[in-house]
Amino acid sequence: MVAVEHAEPIAKKARQIIKKNKLSHKITVYVGNIESESLNDKLISRFQDEFQECQSLKVFDIVMSEWMGYALFFENMLPSVIHARNNFLKRDGLILPDFASLYMVVLLKCWI
């Protein structure tokens, strides 16, 4: 399992929790952006066998992301999720969450 976190303090805390739960051998936390070339190099190194087999980094079964900000789009993380899908997700992989609903209402202020 791989986690990619942009904020160093959050990544550090995640590593502490992972270590405390004795899962360091299963979960690796990287600091950075999913789109960065240096992350691609780290993933190729980490998943060398899978990369050699299919010559692709599309080795992940699930991409899980907290991509929605308030009003769904404020943090603009959707392009990062799309990048992860296009570059790392297996053909039959899942993106979680995989849907969202946005409800809108028109309000008018009328003076009488």
List the predicted regions and their residue ranges:
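Class I SAM-binding transferase module
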Residues: M1-I112
